[in-house]
């Protein structure tokens, strides 16, 4: 029996695909739009660690689907590239002392080798790298279009600064932990700083970003997260006059029906009015409080679980309708960047206001109740009800009626107006780091921004020896005086660079025309392929990459450069592949190499105490990272591909277990060993024809729906059926090889060649069609006899008729061999039971 030499087979076919450019694709206008398919993976950033087994999960899914569609006559575009600018590459360079240009190239080569070893059907001629000049020239060009459209501006603003990373981070890059706000990458401490920043007006597109979600085939959870991040609210903006001041406080509220329950106003610690309106004898306390609160994260300040804090300014405002005096407080739970930076305190009908009022013993005045009568409140009443404690014309009404009347009164008396507000804030676009796209802007002596001419692009990132962050909030580029100062013009360059998200905002468009030096992509090519039909990647990018790229795409659409309103038609988030780790009694996880297994139990080598096996995220510190190179070396790429898809539904998280891949490896060996049987061109038995059409149907339907685990299961069942036969029937084996090929392309190509077909299977075959009528559904065992003696037993559909039963019996190989030179006297058929052939 010849051994399944997967290493040799996989190397052979990977070289064949490379040398023959099997997966290279060009635009062909004769192919109708409905037969074109653009499949995309979220491209990787090339870290020094390389891939672990979790990374290829999404790539394998798109590869299977792409190959399946290719065999179904689709014109498939499936490109790959590298998100090679940004913090991960730069941090690695700083840690190792290797220049990011060099380390990035080395890491990309490592990634490419690992990706190619898995046999993915990428068109490598379309490879892109966001750090290369021919790519970031167009990132800079798009930035200039944003600037010219008034969507990029400079602003001195409070920003999150990470001393460890040496850069400003966007709100979306901050996570809340029990130890306070941290950077999303690295979980480093952050602080608030006032710095000059480039900001993009994503808020101008808030409504469209919200509305167009309805057109997308995306997971509802992702759409809901984007809706919440954009945070649309419809309400009223109300003006409050301040006692002794000409300034006014504007408040946005979605509950104008509670206006008569206002007992205080709260303004954000960032509000510029604070110094102006605070009474002298309150100033010291107020300014101390402001300084303390500005360093907290937005999430920390607004969380319902967090203790509400505040300080009285000593000043008062006037109620816009009743003219009553209302105390003005500064409070941590109000954000200067959301709405107007001020809220009306209605403690009877808002939980945060209720907590605040209780803490500082402020008046709580209910103006809505369920019964229309005063009731004792143990918590804020936030439901609908009847108005109470209000001026006569607003009293004893449904609160919905009060809302309408208040809006009309405020509008008529010019004390307020209807308004839509969003939680979404403009995108902080500057980074004080070296390894990123230089921003193509000059400043004159007065500080006016002057965009570079388009024919001066790319503005190249200068090579420097010291690329470490300055620690002062300035970019490392600011140290290169001869680059910063444009002497012949008397201008200075912008020294901040773009964030990592810039290059990934539009990469899917560059794949369409990666070598074009005259434009970011030819318009006809964009119209040919866009939008992306299937996009697979991690859910962690919901409010970062996915929101940013939608924004840039809409700008390009408005400018007439792209033909679709949205870039990604269908999105799938693959589940996380976790790993096993080990936990001590106190809950502490210990590294895997510190654990020993005895009698199916696990023990800590250090103290010999039993530990519990748990599921945890793969991490270097826990030593539970599985390297795909090791798996491929031991079991092969096809085994790894199939195992990753067989572990469970694509969108579910699941733990990696190397023991589980052994079963998949056996499955592929079973298929390989079919070569040992005679390859017969005879007509196969009806039962195996039925099994073939059943498996084609199942694999077709499940692959179409991305239900890869159940498709693989069906193929495993089929192979066990096929192994029962003495011969390997060509008419069965050939279509099976084709349906196997998206899942195990290397083995399929080898078997395709073995049965005498021309390679590549992916260019010289078509996906087989199933015939429903050939599938035996309600099975009955039929006994085949000659002169009353049993010769065979077969399974047939219950509804098989007498004529067909006779024909099937006469075609049976065991019956045929016993009929040679014999005369048939008669054929007796008992439906759903037997066929008896009487001979002499």
UniProtKB/Swiss-Prot annotation:
EC number: 6.1.1.4
Alphabetical list of InterPro entries matching this protein: aa-tRNA-synth_I_CS, aa-tRNA-synth_Ia, Leu-tRNA-ligase, Leu_tRNA-synth_edit, M/V/L/I-tRNA-synth_anticd-bd, Methionyl/Leucyl_tRNA_Synth, Rossmann-like_a/b/a_fold, tRNAsynth_Ia_anticodon-bd
Pfam families: Anticodon_1, tRNA-synt_1, tRNA-synt_1_2, tRNA-synt_1g
Subcellular location: Cytoplasm
Binding site for ATP: 620
Short sequence motif 'HIGH' region: positions: 44-55
Keyword Membrane: no
Homology family: Belongs to the class-I aminoacyl-tRNA synthetase family.
Entry protein name: Leucine--tRNA ligase
Species assigned in the record: Borreliella burgdorferi (strain ZS7) (Borrelia burgdorferi)
Taxonomic lineage: Bacteria, Pseudomonadati, Spirochaetota, Spirochaetia, Spirochaetales
Name of the encoding gene: leuS
């Amino acid at each position: 029996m010849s051994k399944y030499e997967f290493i040799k087979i996989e190397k052979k076919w990977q070289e064949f695909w490379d040398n023959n450019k099997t997966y290279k694709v060009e635009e062909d206008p004769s192919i109708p739009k409905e037969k074109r398919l653009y499949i995309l993976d979220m491209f990787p950033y090339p870290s020094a660690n390389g891939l672990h087994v979790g990374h290829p999960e999404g790539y394998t899914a798109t590869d299977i689907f792409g190959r399946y569609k290719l065999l179904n006559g689709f014109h498939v575009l499936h490109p790959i590239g590298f998100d090679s600018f940004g913090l991960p590459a730069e941090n690695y360079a700083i840690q190792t002392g290797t220049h990011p240009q060099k380390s990035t190239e080395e890491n990309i080569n490592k990634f490419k080798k690992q990706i190619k070893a898995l046999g993915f059907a990428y068109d490598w001629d379309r490879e892109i790298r966001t750090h290369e000049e021919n790519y970031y020239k167009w990132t800079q060009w798009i930035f200039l279009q944003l600037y010219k459209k008034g969507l990029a501006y400079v602003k001195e603003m409070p920003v999150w600064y990470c001393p460890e990373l040496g850069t400003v981070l966007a709100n979306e890059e901050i996570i809340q932990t029990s130890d306070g706000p941290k950077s999303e990458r690295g979980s480093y401490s952050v602080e608030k700083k006032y710095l000059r920043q480039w900001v993009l007006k994503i808020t101008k597109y808030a409504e469209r970003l919200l509305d167009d979600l309805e057109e997308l085939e995306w997971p509802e959870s992702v759409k809901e997260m984007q809706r919440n991040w954009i945070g649309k609210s419809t309400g009223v903006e109300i003006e409050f006059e301040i006692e002794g001041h000409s300034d006014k406080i504007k408040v946005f509220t979605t509950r104008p029906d509670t206006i008569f329950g206002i007992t205080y106003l709260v303004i954000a610690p960032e509000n510029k009015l604070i110094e102006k309106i605070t009474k002298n004898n309150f100033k010291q306390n107020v300014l101390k409080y402001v300084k303390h609160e500005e360093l907290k994260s937005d999430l920390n300040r607004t969380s319902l679980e967090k203790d509400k804090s505040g300080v009285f300014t000593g000043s008062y405002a006037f109620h816009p309708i009743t003219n009553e005096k209302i105390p003005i407080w500064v409070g941590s739970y109000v954000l200067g960047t959301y709405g107007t930076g001020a809220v009306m305190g209605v403690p009877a009908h808002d939980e945060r206001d209720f907590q605040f009022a209780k803490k500082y013993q402020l008046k709580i005045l209910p103006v809505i109740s369920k019964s229309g009568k005063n009731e004792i409140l143990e918590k804020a009443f936030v439901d609908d009800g009847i108005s109470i404690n209000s001026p006569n014309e607003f009293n004893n009404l449904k609160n919905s009626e009060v809302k309408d009347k208040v809006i009309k009164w405020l509008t008529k008396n010019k004390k307020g107006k209807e308004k839509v507000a969003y939680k979404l804030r403009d995108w902080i676009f500057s980074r004080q780091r070296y390894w990123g796209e230089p921003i193509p802007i000059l400043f004159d002596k007065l500080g006016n921004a002057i965009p570079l001419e388009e024919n001066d692009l790319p503005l190249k990132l200068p090579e420097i020896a010291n690329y470490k962050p300055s620690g002062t909030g300035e970019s490392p580029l600011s140290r290169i005086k001869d680059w910063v100062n444009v002497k012949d013009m008397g201008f200075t360059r912008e020294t901040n660079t773009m964030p990592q998200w810039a290059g990934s905002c539009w990469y899917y468009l560059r794949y369409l025309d990666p070598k074009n030096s005259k434009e970011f992509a030819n318009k006809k090519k964009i119209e040919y392929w866009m939008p992306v039909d299937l996009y697979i990647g991690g859910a962690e990018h919901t409010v970062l990459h996915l929101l940013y790229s939608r924004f840039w795409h809409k700008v390009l659409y408005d400018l007439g450069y792209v033909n679709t309103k949205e870039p990604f038609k269908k999105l799938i988030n693959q589940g996380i592949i976790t790993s096993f780790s080990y936990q001590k009694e106190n809950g502490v996880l210990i590294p895997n190499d510190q654990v020993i297994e005895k009698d199916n139990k696990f023990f800590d080598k250090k103290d010999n105490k039993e530990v519990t096996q748990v599921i945890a995220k793969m991490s270097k510190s826990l030593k539970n990272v599985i390297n795909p190179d090791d798996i491929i070396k031991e079991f092969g790429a096809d085994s790894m591909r199939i195992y990753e898809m067989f572990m469970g539904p694509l969108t579910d998280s699941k733990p990696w277990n190397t023991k589980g891949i052994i079963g998949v490896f056996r499955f592929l060996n079973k298929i390989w060993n079919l070569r040992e049987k005679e390859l017969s061109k005879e007509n196969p038995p009806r039962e195996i024809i039925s099994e073939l059409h059943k498996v084609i149907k199942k694999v077709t339907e499940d692959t179409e729906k991305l239900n890869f685990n159940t498709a693989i299961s069906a193929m495993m069942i089929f192979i066990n059926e096929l192994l029962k036969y003495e011969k390997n029937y060509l008419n069965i084996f050939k279509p099976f090889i084709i349906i196997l090929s998206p899942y195990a392309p290397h083995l399929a190509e080898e078997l395709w060649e073995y049965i005498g077909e021309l390679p590549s299977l992916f260019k010289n075959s078509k996906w087989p069609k199933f015939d429903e009528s050939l599938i035996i559904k309600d099975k009955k065992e039929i006994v085949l006899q000659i002169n009353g003696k049993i010769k065979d037993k077969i399974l047939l559909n219950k509804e098989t008729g007498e004529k067909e039963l006779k024909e099937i019996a006469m075609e049976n190989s065991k019956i045929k061999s016993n009929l040679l030179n014999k005369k048939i006297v008669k054929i007796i058929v008992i439906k759903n039971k037997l066929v008896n052939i009487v001979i002499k």
